[in-house]
Curated annotation (Swiss-Prot):
Pathway this chain belongs to: Cell wall biogenesis; peptidoglycan biosynthesis
Enzyme Commission number(s): 6.3.2.8
Protein's cellular compartments: Cytoplasm
Organism of this sequence: Flavobacterium johnsoniae (strain ATCC 17061 / DSM 2064 / JCM 8514 / BCRC 14874 / CCUG 350202 / NBRC 14942 / NCIMB 11054 / UW101) (Cytophaga johnsonae)
Gene that this polypeptide is encoded by: murC
Highest classification ranks of the organism: Bacteria, Pseudomonadati, Bacteroidota, Flavobacteriia, Flavobacteriales
Identification of the protein by name: UDP-N-acetylmuramate--L-alanine ligase
Length: 449
Protein backbone atom coordinates (compact mmCIF):
# COMPACT_ATOMS: atom_id res chain seq x y z
CA UNK A 1 0.00 0.00 0.00
CA UNK A 2 1.34 3.44 -1.01
CA UNK A 3 0.33 6.14 1.46
CA UNK A 4 1.44 8.83 -1.01
CA UNK A 5 -1.59 7.99 -3.17
CA UNK A 6 -3.96 8.53 -0.24
CA UNK A 7 -5.57 11.98 0.05
CA UNK A 8 -8.13 11.30 2.79
CA UNK A 9 -7.96 9.29 6.00
CA UNK A 10 -11.16 8.34 7.82
CA UNK A 11 -11.07 6.95 11.36
CA UNK A 12 -13.79 4.80 12.93
CA UNK A 13 -13.02 5.26 16.61
CA UNK A 14 -10.89 8.39 16.21
CA UNK A 15 -11.04 9.27 19.92
CA UNK A 16 -8.91 6.36 21.11
CA UNK A 17 -5.49 7.27 22.43
CA UNK A 18 -3.62 5.33 19.74
CA UNK A 19 -5.99 6.28 16.92
CA UNK A 20 -5.78 9.98 17.76
CA UNK A 21 -1.97 9.91 17.50
CA UNK A 22 -2.30 8.52 13.96
CA UNK A 23 -4.92 11.17 13.17
CA UNK A 24 -2.51 13.91 14.30
CA UNK A 25 0.25 12.36 12.17
CA UNK A 26 -1.82 12.21 8.98
CA UNK A 27 -3.07 15.75 9.56
CA UNK A 28 0.52 16.94 9.95
CA UNK A 29 1.71 15.33 6.68
CA UNK A 30 -1.08 17.05 4.77
CA UNK A 31 -3.86 14.48 4.48
CA UNK A 32 -7.52 15.40 4.95
CA UNK A 33 -8.58 13.71 8.18
CA UNK A 34 -12.01 13.10 9.66
CA UNK A 35 -13.78 10.42 11.62
CA UNK A 36 -16.37 9.03 13.98
CA UNK A 37 -16.33 8.29 17.66
CA UNK A 38 -19.01 7.11 20.05
CA UNK A 39 -18.61 9.89 22.60
CA UNK A 40 -16.95 13.31 22.85
CA UNK A 41 -13.86 13.52 25.07
CA UNK A 42 -10.91 15.77 25.83
CA UNK A 43 -9.01 14.01 23.04
CA UNK A 44 -11.70 14.55 20.42
CA UNK A 45 -11.97 18.21 21.47
CA UNK A 46 -8.23 18.65 20.92
CA UNK A 47 -8.47 16.97 17.49
CA UNK A 48 -11.39 19.19 16.47
CA UNK A 49 -9.42 22.27 17.56
CA UNK A 50 -6.59 21.14 15.27
CA UNK A 51 -8.96 21.17 12.28
CA UNK A 52 -10.09 17.55 12.15
CA UNK A 53 -13.80 16.99 11.45
CA UNK A 54 -15.38 14.55 13.94
CA UNK A 55 -18.97 13.42 14.45
CA UNK A 56 -20.51 11.27 17.17
CA UNK A 57 -23.43 9.64 15.36
CA UNK A 58 -23.12 6.38 13.40
CA UNK A 59 -24.52 7.86 10.20
CA UNK A 60 -23.20 7.25 6.68
CA UNK A 61 -24.58 10.65 5.59
CA UNK A 62 -21.96 12.30 7.80
CA UNK A 63 -19.05 10.72 5.89
CA UNK A 64 -17.53 13.48 3.68
CA UNK A 65 -18.86 13.17 0.13
CA UNK A 66 -15.42 13.60 -1.49
CA UNK A 67 -13.90 10.60 0.34
CA UNK A 68 -13.77 8.37 -2.73
CA UNK A 69 -12.73 4.73 -2.75
CA UNK A 70 -9.62 5.40 -4.84
CA UNK A 71 -8.13 8.10 -2.58
CA UNK A 72 -9.29 7.23 0.94
CA UNK A 73 -7.83 5.03 3.66
CA UNK A 74 -10.17 3.87 6.42
CA UNK A 75 -8.64 3.01 9.80
CA UNK A 76 -10.70 1.25 12.45
CA UNK A 77 -10.36 0.13 16.03
CA UNK A 78 -11.11 -3.50 16.99
CA UNK A 79 -13.61 -2.12 19.52
CA UNK A 80 -16.03 -1.17 16.70
CA UNK A 81 -19.09 -3.47 16.80
CA UNK A 82 -19.92 -5.61 13.77
CA UNK A 83 -23.27 -3.81 13.45
CA UNK A 84 -21.67 -0.40 12.81
CA UNK A 85 -23.29 1.11 9.70
CA UNK A 86 -20.32 3.25 8.63
CA UNK A 87 -18.08 0.18 8.88
CA UNK A 88 -20.47 -1.72 6.56
CA UNK A 89 -20.62 1.26 4.18
CA UNK A 90 -16.86 1.13 3.60
CA UNK A 91 -16.72 -2.68 3.37
CA UNK A 92 -19.52 -2.88 0.80
CA UNK A 93 -17.78 -0.29 -1.41
CA UNK A 94 -14.36 -1.98 -1.21
CA UNK A 95 -12.50 0.85 0.50
CA UNK A 96 -8.98 0.19 1.76
CA UNK A 97 -9.63 -0.65 5.42
CA UNK A 98 -6.81 -1.23 7.90
CA UNK A 99 -6.36 -1.73 11.62
CA UNK A 100 -4.31 0.89 13.46
CA UNK A 101 -1.47 -1.62 13.94
CA UNK A 102 -1.36 -2.43 10.22
CA UNK A 103 -1.04 1.26 9.39
CA UNK A 104 1.73 1.68 11.95
CA UNK A 105 3.49 -1.24 10.28
CA UNK A 106 3.20 0.48 6.88
CA UNK A 107 4.43 3.84 8.23
CA UNK A 108 7.39 2.36 10.09
CA UNK A 109 8.60 -0.34 7.68
CA UNK A 110 10.82 2.07 5.75
CA UNK A 111 12.17 3.79 8.88
CA UNK A 112 14.58 2.84 11.64
CA UNK A 113 11.96 1.59 14.06
CA UNK A 114 11.96 1.25 17.84
CA UNK A 115 9.15 -0.88 19.30
CA UNK A 116 8.22 -1.03 22.99
CA UNK A 117 6.26 -4.13 24.05
CA UNK A 118 4.99 -5.32 27.41
CA UNK A 119 1.79 -5.77 29.37
CA UNK A 120 2.77 -2.75 31.49
CA UNK A 121 5.07 0.19 30.89
CA UNK A 122 4.69 0.58 27.11
CA UNK A 123 3.46 4.15 27.14
CA UNK A 124 5.94 5.44 29.71
CA UNK A 125 8.94 3.71 28.13
CA UNK A 126 8.07 4.76 24.57
CA UNK A 127 7.41 8.34 25.71
CA UNK A 128 10.75 8.59 27.53
CA UNK A 129 12.54 7.07 24.53
CA UNK A 130 10.76 9.40 22.09
CA UNK A 131 11.67 12.38 24.29
CA UNK A 132 15.35 11.36 24.53
CA UNK A 133 15.64 10.86 20.76
CA UNK A 134 13.76 14.08 19.94
CA UNK A 135 15.76 16.17 22.40
CA UNK A 136 19.02 14.73 21.07
CA UNK A 137 18.18 15.87 17.54
CA UNK A 138 17.15 12.56 15.97
CA UNK A 139 14.77 12.76 12.98
CA UNK A 140 12.08 10.95 14.97
CA UNK A 141 8.33 10.58 15.22
CA UNK A 142 7.04 8.73 18.29
CA UNK A 143 3.47 7.38 18.38
CA UNK A 144 2.58 6.89 22.04
CA UNK A 145 -0.47 5.77 24.00
CA UNK A 146 -0.69 8.75 26.32
CA UNK A 147 -0.52 12.53 26.35
CA UNK A 148 3.11 13.44 27.07
CA UNK A 149 3.22 16.49 29.33
CA UNK A 150 6.29 17.99 27.62
CA UNK A 151 4.42 18.12 24.29
CA UNK A 152 0.75 18.06 25.35
CA UNK A 153 0.35 15.42 22.64
CA UNK A 154 0.54 11.70 21.98
CA UNK A 155 2.79 12.41 19.00
CA UNK A 156 6.42 13.42 19.62
CA UNK A 157 8.37 14.97 16.76
CA UNK A 158 7.75 15.08 13.02
CA UNK A 159 10.70 13.05 11.77
CA UNK A 160 10.72 10.92 8.65
CA UNK A 161 13.52 8.41 9.19
CA UNK A 162 13.19 7.18 12.82
CA UNK A 163 10.01 5.99 14.54
CA UNK A 164 9.07 4.90 18.04
CA UNK A 165 5.88 2.86 18.46
CA UNK A 166 4.11 1.03 21.22
CA UNK A 167 3.94 -2.64 20.32
CA UNK A 168 0.46 -3.47 21.57
CA UNK A 169 -0.26 -7.11 22.42
CA UNK A 170 -4.04 -6.58 22.22
CA UNK A 171 -5.45 -8.55 19.28
CA UNK A 172 -1.82 -9.58 18.47
CA UNK A 173 -1.41 -6.15 16.89
CA UNK A 174 2.34 -5.96 17.51
CA UNK A 175 3.01 -8.74 15.02
CA UNK A 176 2.45 -6.19 12.21
CA UNK A 177 5.59 -4.27 13.23
CA UNK A 178 9.17 -4.57 11.94
CA UNK A 179 11.42 -3.31 14.77
CA UNK A 180 15.14 -2.63 14.48
CA UNK A 181 15.48 -2.14 18.25
CA UNK A 182 12.85 -3.34 20.71
CA UNK A 183 12.20 -4.04 24.36
CA UNK A 184 9.76 -6.16 26.33
CA UNK A 185 8.99 -4.65 29.74
CA UNK A 186 6.72 -7.42 31.07
CA UNK A 187 4.66 -10.43 29.99
CA UNK A 188 1.91 -10.64 32.61
CA UNK A 189 -1.44 -12.14 31.71
CA UNK A 190 -3.95 -9.62 30.31
CA UNK A 191 -6.50 -9.51 27.50
CA UNK A 192 -7.60 -13.04 28.34
CA UNK A 193 -10.83 -12.24 26.48
CA UNK A 194 -8.69 -12.30 23.32
CA UNK A 195 -6.01 -14.89 24.15
CA UNK A 196 -7.83 -17.33 26.41
CA UNK A 197 -4.76 -18.40 28.41
CA UNK A 198 -1.59 -16.84 29.80
CA UNK A 199 0.42 -19.38 27.76
CA UNK A 200 -1.09 -17.97 24.57
CA UNK A 201 -0.08 -14.44 25.62
CA UNK A 202 3.47 -15.61 26.32
CA UNK A 203 3.66 -17.33 22.93
CA UNK A 204 2.59 -14.10 21.26
CA UNK A 205 5.34 -12.12 23.02
CA UNK A 206 7.89 -14.77 22.02
CA UNK A 207 6.76 -14.41 18.40
CA UNK A 208 7.14 -10.63 18.66
CA UNK A 209 10.64 -10.99 20.13
CA UNK A 210 11.63 -13.24 17.21
CA UNK A 211 11.12 -10.25 14.89
CA UNK A 212 14.32 -8.74 16.31
CA UNK A 213 16.95 -10.95 14.67
CA UNK A 214 19.93 -9.29 16.38
CA UNK A 215 19.36 -10.14 20.05
CA UNK A 216 21.80 -7.41 21.10
CA UNK A 217 19.02 -5.04 20.00
CA UNK A 218 16.30 -6.66 22.16
CA UNK A 219 16.09 -5.43 25.76
CA UNK A 220 14.32 -7.40 28.47
CA UNK A 221 13.88 -7.60 32.23
CA UNK A 222 15.68 -10.46 33.98
CA UNK A 223 12.64 -12.59 34.76
CA UNK A 224 11.41 -12.90 31.16
CA UNK A 225 11.88 -16.20 29.24
CA UNK A 226 13.42 -14.43 26.25
CA UNK A 227 16.88 -14.12 24.74
CA UNK A 228 18.06 -10.52 24.86
CA UNK A 229 20.01 -7.85 26.73
CA UNK A 230 19.00 -7.85 30.39
CA UNK A 231 18.20 -4.67 32.31
CA UNK A 232 17.80 -4.54 36.09
CA UNK A 233 17.82 -2.36 39.19
CA UNK A 234 20.40 -3.29 41.85
CA UNK A 235 20.99 -6.70 40.22
CA UNK A 236 23.68 -7.96 37.86
CA UNK A 237 22.67 -7.14 34.29
CA UNK A 238 24.14 -5.70 31.10
CA UNK A 239 22.36 -2.41 31.89
CA UNK A 240 22.14 -1.92 35.65
CA UNK A 241 20.67 1.01 37.59
CA UNK A 242 22.20 1.22 41.06
CA UNK A 243 23.16 3.67 43.81
CA UNK A 244 19.51 4.76 43.69
CA UNK A 245 18.46 7.53 46.05
CA UNK A 246 15.73 10.15 46.29
CA UNK A 247 16.63 13.85 46.29
CA UNK A 248 13.96 16.59 46.25
CA UNK A 249 11.35 14.06 45.12
CA UNK A 250 13.47 12.84 42.18
CA UNK A 251 15.38 9.63 41.66
CA UNK A 252 19.14 10.09 41.36
CA UNK A 253 21.03 7.01 40.20
CA UNK A 254 23.93 5.57 38.24
CA UNK A 255 23.71 3.26 35.22
CA UNK A 256 26.29 0.66 34.28
CA UNK A 257 26.38 0.08 30.51
CA UNK A 258 28.65 -2.17 28.39
CA UNK A 259 30.90 0.82 27.64
CA UNK A 260 30.72 3.20 30.61
CA UNK A 261 29.11 4.19 33.90
CA UNK A 262 26.58 7.02 33.61
CA UNK A 263 26.73 8.90 36.91
CA UNK A 264 24.10 10.84 38.86
CA UNK A 265 21.22 10.69 36.39
CA UNK A 266 18.13 12.56 37.60
CA UNK A 267 14.61 11.29 36.86
CA UNK A 268 11.35 12.75 38.12
CA UNK A 269 8.86 9.89 37.73
CA UNK A 270 8.15 8.09 41.03
CA UNK A 271 8.07 4.34 41.58
CA UNK A 272 10.55 1.55 40.86
CA UNK A 273 8.44 0.51 37.85
CA UNK A 274 9.05 3.92 36.26
CA UNK A 275 12.75 3.74 37.05
CA UNK A 276 12.80 0.43 35.16
CA UNK A 277 10.94 2.03 32.24
CA UNK A 278 13.51 4.82 32.20
CA UNK A 279 16.37 2.30 32.24
CA UNK A 280 14.90 0.48 29.23
CA UNK A 281 14.65 3.76 27.31
CA UNK A 282 18.23 4.67 28.25
CA UNK A 283 19.49 1.26 27.05
CA UNK A 284 17.74 1.57 23.68
CA UNK A 285 18.89 5.16 23.14
CA UNK A 286 22.46 4.26 24.11
CA UNK A 287 22.45 1.32 21.67
CA UNK A 288 21.21 3.64 18.92
CA UNK A 289 24.20 5.90 19.57
CA UNK A 290 22.63 8.79 21.45
CA UNK A 291 25.35 10.70 23.37
CA UNK A 292 25.45 10.19 27.13
CA UNK A 293 25.07 13.88 27.97
CA UNK A 294 22.00 14.14 25.71
CA UNK A 295 20.41 11.14 27.44
CA UNK A 296 21.11 12.60 30.89
CA UNK A 297 19.70 16.01 29.97
CA UNK A 298 16.58 14.56 28.35
CA UNK A 299 15.69 12.10 31.10
CA UNK A 300 16.01 14.88 33.70
CA UNK A 301 13.60 17.08 31.73
CA UNK A 302 10.93 14.43 31.14
CA UNK A 303 7.73 15.64 32.83
CA UNK A 304 5.63 12.49 32.62
CA UNK A 305 2.40 11.45 30.95
CA UNK A 306 -1.14 12.53 31.58
CA UNK A 307 -2.89 9.96 33.83
CA UNK A 308 0.37 8.12 34.67
CA UNK A 309 1.02 8.97 38.34
CA UNK A 310 -0.04 12.47 37.34
CA UNK A 311 0.05 15.03 40.15
CA UNK A 312 -3.11 17.14 40.17
CA UNK A 313 -2.52 18.76 43.57
CA UNK A 314 0.78 18.72 45.45
CA UNK A 315 0.78 20.67 48.70
CA UNK A 316 1.82 20.08 52.30
CA UNK A 317 -1.81 19.52 53.33
CA UNK A 318 -3.10 17.52 50.38
CA UNK A 319 -1.76 15.44 47.49
CA UNK A 320 -4.02 14.30 44.63
CA UNK A 321 -2.60 11.87 42.07
CA UNK A 322 -4.39 10.39 39.04
CA UNK A 323 -3.29 7.15 37.38
CA UNK A 324 -4.44 5.00 34.44
CA UNK A 325 -3.64 1.69 36.19
CA UNK A 326 -6.14 -1.04 35.29
CA UNK A 327 -4.33 -4.28 36.19
CA UNK A 328 -3.31 -5.57 39.65
CA UNK A 329 0.40 -5.30 38.85
CA UNK A 330 -0.05 -1.65 37.88
CA UNK A 331 -2.04 -0.91 41.04
CA UNK A 332 0.74 -2.51 43.09
CA UNK A 333 3.22 -0.19 41.35
CA UNK A 334 1.09 2.87 42.20
CA UNK A 335 0.89 1.72 45.82
CA UNK A 336 4.66 1.18 46.02
CA UNK A 337 5.35 4.66 44.64
CA UNK A 338 2.88 6.36 47.01
CA UNK A 339 4.27 4.56 50.06
CA UNK A 340 7.84 5.40 49.06
CA UNK A 341 7.03 9.10 48.68
CA UNK A 342 4.55 9.49 51.55
CA UNK A 343 5.39 6.93 54.24
CA UNK A 344 3.00 6.78 57.19
CA UNK A 345 0.29 8.98 55.64
CA UNK A 346 -3.28 7.82 55.02
CA UNK A 347 -4.00 7.06 51.37
CA UNK A 348 -7.46 6.93 49.77
CA UNK A 349 -7.69 4.96 46.51
CA UNK A 350 -10.67 5.55 44.20
CA UNK A 351 -10.78 2.71 41.66
CA UNK A 352 -12.99 2.24 38.61
CA UNK A 353 -12.60 -1.33 37.24
CA UNK A 354 -12.19 -1.49 33.45
CA UNK A 355 -13.96 -4.29 31.52
CA UNK A 356 -16.11 -7.07 32.98
CA UNK A 357 -13.76 -9.72 31.56
CA UNK A 358 -10.66 -8.18 33.13
CA UNK A 359 -12.45 -7.80 36.47
CA UNK A 360 -13.47 -11.47 36.31
CA UNK A 361 -10.05 -12.74 35.24
CA UNK A 362 -8.04 -10.82 37.84
CA UNK A 363 -10.54 -10.39 40.68
CA UNK A 364 -8.30 -11.93 43.35
CA UNK A 365 -5.36 -9.81 42.23
CA UNK A 366 -7.46 -6.64 42.24
CA UNK A 367 -8.78 -7.45 45.72
CA UNK A 368 -5.26 -7.99 47.05
CA UNK A 369 -3.71 -4.91 45.42
CA UNK A 370 -6.54 -2.56 46.42
CA UNK A 371 -6.64 -3.84 50.01
CA UNK A 372 -3.15 -2.38 50.56
CA UNK A 373 -4.52 1.16 50.60
CA UNK A 374 -5.85 2.68 53.83
CA UNK A 375 -9.28 3.48 52.37
CA UNK A 376 -10.89 2.34 49.10
CA UNK A 377 -13.82 3.73 47.11
CA UNK A 378 -14.89 1.26 44.40
CA UNK A 379 -16.89 2.58 41.45
CA UNK A 380 -19.04 0.57 39.03
CA UNK A 381 -17.24 -1.38 36.31
CA UNK A 382 -16.59 0.63 33.15
CA UNK A 383 -17.76 -1.64 30.29
CA UNK A 384 -15.92 -0.07 27.30
CA UNK A 385 -16.48 -2.55 24.45
CA UNK A 386 -18.26 -5.19 26.58
CA UNK A 387 -21.75 -6.18 27.64
CA UNK A 388 -22.43 -6.97 31.33
CA UNK A 389 -21.54 -10.45 32.60
CA UNK A 390 -23.76 -12.21 35.10
CA UNK A 391 -22.37 -12.03 38.62
CA UNK A 392 -19.40 -9.82 37.71
CA UNK A 393 -20.01 -6.59 39.62
CA UNK A 394 -18.09 -4.14 41.76
CA UNK A 395 -19.94 -5.46 44.82
CA UNK A 396 -18.63 -8.96 44.00
CA UNK A 397 -15.10 -7.55 43.82
CA UNK A 398 -15.58 -5.54 47.01
CA UNK A 399 -16.61 -8.69 48.88
CA UNK A 400 -13.25 -10.27 47.99
CA UNK A 401 -11.27 -7.42 49.54
CA UNK A 402 -9.88 -7.68 53.08
CA UNK A 403 -9.57 -3.97 53.87
CA UNK A 404 -12.41 -3.01 56.27
CA UNK A 405 -12.33 0.64 55.06
CA UNK A 406 -13.90 -0.02 51.68
CA UNK A 407 -17.22 0.80 50.01
CA UNK A 408 -19.04 1.13 46.71
CA UNK A 409 -19.44 4.74 45.59
CA UNK A 410 -21.74 5.79 42.73
CA UNK A 411 -20.35 8.26 40.21
CA UNK A 412 -22.85 10.94 41.23
CA UNK A 413 -21.79 10.63 44.88
CA UNK A 414 -18.04 10.56 44.31
CA UNK A 415 -17.23 14.23 44.87
CA UNK A 416 -19.12 14.34 48.17
CA UNK A 417 -17.53 11.10 49.40
CA UNK A 418 -14.00 12.29 48.56
CA UNK A 419 -14.71 15.60 50.27
CA UNK A 420 -15.82 13.75 53.41
CA UNK A 421 -12.64 11.65 53.59
CA UNK A 422 -9.85 12.74 55.93
CA UNK A 423 -7.10 11.16 53.79
CA UNK A 424 -4.34 13.65 52.90
CA UNK A 425 -3.24 11.50 49.93
CA UNK A 426 -5.88 10.75 47.28
CA UNK A 427 -5.31 8.58 44.20
CA UNK A 428 -7.87 8.06 41.41
CA UNK A 429 -7.14 4.87 39.46
CA UNK A 430 -8.60 3.33 36.29
CA UNK A 431 -8.70 3.31 32.49
CA UNK A 432 -12.39 4.19 32.07
CA UNK A 433 -14.17 7.53 32.18
CA UNK A 434 -12.88 8.27 35.68
CA UNK A 435 -10.28 10.29 33.80
CA UNK A 436 -13.02 12.66 32.65
CA UNK A 437 -13.91 13.34 36.30
CA UNK A 438 -10.41 14.44 37.30
CA UNK A 439 -10.91 18.18 36.60
CA UNK A 440 -14.05 18.34 38.76
CA UNK A 441 -12.37 16.35 41.57
CA UNK A 442 -9.36 18.66 41.42
CA UNK A 443 -11.57 21.77 41.48
CA UNK A 444 -13.53 20.52 44.49
CA UNK A 445 -10.38 19.62 46.42
CA UNK A 446 -8.70 22.95 45.66
CA UNK A 447 -11.75 24.76 46.99
CA UNK A 448 -11.57 22.78 50.23
CA UNK A 449 -7.86 22.74 51.04
Amino acid sequence: MNLNQIENVYFIGIGGIGMSALARYFKYIGKKVSGYDKTPSMLTSELIESGIDIHFEDNINLIPSNYYVENTLVIFTPAVPASHSEWHYFIERNYQIKKRAEVLGIITKDTFSFAVAGTHGKTTTSSILGHILHQSGADVTAFVGGIVENYNSNLIGTGKTVTVVEADEFDRSFLHLHPDIACVTSMDADHLDIYGTSDAIQASFIEFASKVEDKSKLFITKELPLEGVQCAINEDAVYKAYNVRIEDGNYVFDVQTPSEIMKDLRFGLPGKHNLMNGLMAIAMAKTYGTPTDAIAKAIASFNGIRRRFSYQIKSDKLVYIDDYAHHPTEINAVHQAVRELYPGRKVLAVFQPHLFSRTRDFADGFAESLSQFDEVFLMDIYPARELPMEGITSQWLLDKMTNPNRKIVAKEDLLAEIKASDAPIIVTIGAGDIGEMVPSIKKMLNENI
